């Protein structure tokens, strides 16, 4: 008579199956643990934060510029205020200022003349160009640690204020701004 260990049959198959299952489970858990234990992302640098916020506000303003009806680009909330199109050109002028100042060039805030941009197509194209120029400047002349984030922070604040003003142009025309519309699922 052959003696067998408890939990096995005469050829040891039951113990082998149990061992294989435990080994597989351990391997699976180890794989999951390694995948989940990736090091956390390092905190954003001031340059990365600046670019993210700058891109964010410009994306919102560009979306409004593209969305607002062309026949309403001359609309003014009050006679003495800028038209919708002129506000977009003013925001674009801030971008031109930021890009030049970011490269160390002499820059004036309102050096862009709104009279040179009469149509929605012209205004949107100029805004897109100014955004691309800012992106190129931020890439070529990154904000180093300890370096001031001016002019970028001032232009971001300014553009954000005008974004809020542009919402009023939408509402005064019975329109819903893009960011306030229900998101499709």
Model-derived features with residue positions:
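Boundary at the C-terminal end of the N-terminal hydrophobic targeting segment
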Residues: 35-37
């Amino acid at each position: 008579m052959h003696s067998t260990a408890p939990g096995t049959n005469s050829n040891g198959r039951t113990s082998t199956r149990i061992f294989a299952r435990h080994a597989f489970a351990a391997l699976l858990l180890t794989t999951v643990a390694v995948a989940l234990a990736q090091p956390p992302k390092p905190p954003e640098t001031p340059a990365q934060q600046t670019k993210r916020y700058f891109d964010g506000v410009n994306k919102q303003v560009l979306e409004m510029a593209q969305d607002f009806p062309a026949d309403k680009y001359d609309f003014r909330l009050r006679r003495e205020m800028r038209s919708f199109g002129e506000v977009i050109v003013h925001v674009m002028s801030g971008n031109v200022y930021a890009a030049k100042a970011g490269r160390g060039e002499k820059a004036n805030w309102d050096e862009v003349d709104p009279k040179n941009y009469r149509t929605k197509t012209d205004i949107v194209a100029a805004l897109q160009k100014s955004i691309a120029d800012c992106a190129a400047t931020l890439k070529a002349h990154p904000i180093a640690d300890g370096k001031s984030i001016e002019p970028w922070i001032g232009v971001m604040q300014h553009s954000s204020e005008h974004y809020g003003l542009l919402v009023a142009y939408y509402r005064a025309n019975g329109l819903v701004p893009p960011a306030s519309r229900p998101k499709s699922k």
